[in-house]
Amino acid sequence: MFTFDLTRLDPALALSAAEVLDQIGAKTGENGVPVNAKQGGEGLRVSLQDGVLIEYQHKWEFFRGLALARRVLRSGETIEEHPGFYRLGFFEDLSRGAVLTVDSLKKKIRYLAAMGYNAFTLYIEDIYEVPEYPWFGHQRGRYTKAELKEAVAYGKRFGVTLNPSLQVLGHLEMPLIWPAFKDIKDSSAVLYVGKPEVYEFIDKLFKNLCECFESRHFYLNMDEAHTMGLGRRLAKEGYVPKGELLAIHMEHVGKLCEKHGIVPIIATDMFFRPYTAGNGYYSTDTIVPQEVIDRVPEMYRIMYWDYYNCEKSEKSAAMFEHMLQQHERFHNPLMFLGGAWKWMGFAPNNVFSLYSSDFHINGCLRHGIDDISVATFGDDGSEASMFSNLPTLVLYAEKLYKNTTEKVDIEEAFMDLFGLPLEAFLALDCPNRIPDGPDIPNSASANPCKYLFYNDPLNGRLTRLVSHSYKPHFAECEEKLAVWKADRQFGYIFETLSALCRVLKNLATLPLELREAYANCDKAGLEALADSIPGIVSDLDDFTDKFRAQWLRENKMFGLETLELRFGGQRGRLVSTEKLLRLYLDGKLDRIEPLETPLLYPDGKDAAEPDRPVNNYVEYCYDNTLPAGVPHC
């Protein structure tokens, strides 16, 4: 392990450098290798000159250079990089339950700085304080103004600009559940376009965020507003095409942006959906009409987001290329947003993220897109660790600093940054890599570790997808993940997922085994299964404890209640299942009717397909009976 002497640096820079070095497992001390810094010129250069010399243009490059210093010391070779971007950013979803503590935000900032990112965007639908609207973000863990200001100031120390990503059209399910917002509501998630009260509301959002963020680059999104104009507005004013409503809304919001000095950035899917079959975003033949393009005010920057398309098929690759070409027809500055998958359940999808991201970055470089970010989301409750998808962040940095479309090896960079081999974090995917699951190119939203966890023991909608091979698979995953549970920084993530696999090695196949024993009138088998349930419940309790510890280590307490209610519901069903089995075995019940119901494929088809067991949110795992007030997020 190298020790670095920071005494030659400016004191403020040395303080931040010490925090980054500590974060990535390096030591500091006056007897260490001297670190010298020289700002000027273009790009980043790290060499051995009277210790380590870091020559950089921008502050964020210095911290990347600091992280590269150990590589230079090991090899004795100079590293020189000429980044191929204007902005390299990371989007963190803080709106689906998990809200990072300020300490966790700072930890993310230090890691982003060490990788060389210069932007950190907080996706906060209603996760910020707006005093004029006390119900906005109520009981959701919203950040106070003081917390946001603290995070912004901290990022500035490392050259990492914090930006807000908010919603000013759709994706507002959570605040709009409150009666206080009934006057600005069109449908359950979408604002009433054109209504004056809506723009008074947005004005207050802008005002309060401008008090917290120094950056005026605001990501306003306006994406996936599928029911725009189809709710209360339709009933009161009649039908207006979505394209016209979007233009009206952009004009009103644009005036507010001018008032507050905001540079607005919006998603583009709502420009494409009216002209794409099935109201989709991606297509190989959709042509956005020129009149639609011309109606987008020049003040807006546009964001093409794509987490799915890749080289999995000629059609998918062609779709990505066509979408890039369509976006180039707009007269607005273009940015690209890719995905670091962890939003389909308890485990990330690092392997697919690396596979698709390499393709996305190459496309951006070919088309000269220099504003590039990678996002992560927390759909349906933010069940995965907020630090479980780091490999993709490393890939974005390594490729864009090298400005290359060639394959890059991120293993050395990953080990230097996080103190674990890349294979460890790729192993976090294993709970979703079931034996009969889809191959990597088709595995974007595969989440068996979620739907198997929530599948009801007796009434399981998804039991048709279960295989006996899952038991040894999850037993192997349990052991594989436990290898790294002692790691200082991230051991808790491996411990939590190992505990999940310990539950699943018996729970996943329980519904299938119950059906088989019941169908065969195998009462001895049913009794053995009933006897196994208390052990599963005990394992579930242990997983719940470890999951809670993981949550509280990373996040505010808010949002945990939703998942604990779900866990408790499954626990209750297991306890009830054992009791029902005992009643049946004792002759007090004549039948267990759910076990007599034929099994069907949940998607309505009648034959297995390799890519079928994917994308099952918790509401599909059992009847829509979440307790009142518990969001599906």
Predicted region positions:
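Feature activates predominantly on carbohydrate-active enzymes
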Residues: 1-3, 49-265, 335-338, 343, ...
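Short, well-ordered secondary-structure micro-motifs within conserved domains or adaptor modules
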Residues: 2-4, 19-55
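Residues that cap or initiate secondary-structure elements
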Residues: 10, 39-41, 60, 96-98, ...
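Generic preference for hydrophobic/aromatic residues in regular secondary structure cores
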Residues: 35, 78-82, 96, 136, ...
